[in-house]
């Protein structure tokens, strides 16, 4: 049987089978991972930072996420491993001289080249557009292509000369296997830092305890002598310290004058002359005393008798 117009329908047009899985466009996925921030989904602009798993972020978005970690604003899966700014590294990127994306005005009749990248590898010159594998160093933040590190094998950064190890190399936007390896390294690194902090705290506590014990322990001058300690009838000990005055030592030596005693005598005489005006004001002074002839032979309530 045919339909109107003489058309004959087929089976696949009438019977609906299972839906096919939606395939994501690879170019669109690369653009989203290499040109946009993982947190805010905005275009990447300097300063650009990368986490220990190789994901790219805007630094402003990371700071906002750390200040307000609400699940409504940012996806927690993308930044759940970021606890502070120490967990991210600011990237030192090399600009592409042939890139003019923001300078030219984009119109509907112009062709937008997605493959052109804003940054390139400073050694080989490959564009950082997702077609080639790129990595950065945790020590300095310089970004290179993986090909450059394989072709020129060194233990020093090609750009700034900072030494690095194999563990410091982190691949940007790697596949699932790369992310698993980087995650394991991140966990080991954080566990190692925690153990180092604990060991430092234990060492500081031990050093403080040693200082306290050294301050409390008596030195050679503070050791008690058995001759100086005399046991009393009540069981208590009294400490008797015998000291010799400096006057006795100086007097025992012939031909030497005691300078301390003369200094004290002079000081007393000086004070007596200075206080002469003040002593005249009191009745105990010699000028205020009456002679015996003027003194009365009886005692009154306020006897002025001296």
From Swiss-Prot:
Functional note: Replication termination factor which is a component of the elongating replisome. Interacts with nascent DNA.
Region annotated Disordered, chain positions: 193-265
Subcellular location: Chromosome
Family indicated by similarity: Belongs to the rtf2 family.
Gene Ontology MF terms in the entry: DNA binding
Tree of life domain: Eukaryota
Pfam families in UniProt: Rtf2
Keywords assigned by UniProt, alphabetized: Chromosome, Phosphoprotein
Protein name per Swiss-Prot or TrEMBL: Replication termination factor 2
Organism: Gallus gallus (Chicken)
Phosphoprotein recorded as keyword: yes
Signal peptide interval: none
Record flagged with keyword Nucleotide-binding: no
GO biological process: cellular response to hydroxyurea; mitotic DNA replication termination; regulation of DNA stability
Entry's Gene Ontology cellular component terms: nucleus; replication fork
Composition bias type Basic and acidic residues, residue spans: 235-250
């Amino acid at each position: 049987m045919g339909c109107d117009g003489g058309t004959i329908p087929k089976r696949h047009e009438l019977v609906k089978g299972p839906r096919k899985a939606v395939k994501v466009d690879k170019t669109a996925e690369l653009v989203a991972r290499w040109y946009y921030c993982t947190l805010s989904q905005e275009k990447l602009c300097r300063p650009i930072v990368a986490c220990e798993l190789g994901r790219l972020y805007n630094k402003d978005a990371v700071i906002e996420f750390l200040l307000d970690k609400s699940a409504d604003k940012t996806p927690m899966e993308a930044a759940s491993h970021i606890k502070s700014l120490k967990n991210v590294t600011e990237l030192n990127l090399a600009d592409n001289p042939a890139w003019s994306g923001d300078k030219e005005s984009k119109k509907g009749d112009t062709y937008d080249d997605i493959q052109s990248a804003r940054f390139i590898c400073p050694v080989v010159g490959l564009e950082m557009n997702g077609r080639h594998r790129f990595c950065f160093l945790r020590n300095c933040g310089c970004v290179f292509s993986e090909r450059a590190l394989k072709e020129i094998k060194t233990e020093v950064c090609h750009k700034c000369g900072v030494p690095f190890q194999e563990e410091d190399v982190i691949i940007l936007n790697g596949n699932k296997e790369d992310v698993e390896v980087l995650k394991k390294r991140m966990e080991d690194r954080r566990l190692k830092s925690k153990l180092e902090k604990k060991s430092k705290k234990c060492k500081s506590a031990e050093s403080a305890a040693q200082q306290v014990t050294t301050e409390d322990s008596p030195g050679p001058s503070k050791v008690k002598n058995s001759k100086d300690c005399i046991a009393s009838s009540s069981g208590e000990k009294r400490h008797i310290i015998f000291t010799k005055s400096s006057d006795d030592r100086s007097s025992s030596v012939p031909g030497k004058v005691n300078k301390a005693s003369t200094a004290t005598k002079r000081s007393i005489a000086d004070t007596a002359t200075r206080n002469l005006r003040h002593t005249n004001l009191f009745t105990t002074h010699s000028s205020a005393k009456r002679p015996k002839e003027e003194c009365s032979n009886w005692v009154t309530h306020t006897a002025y008798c001296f």
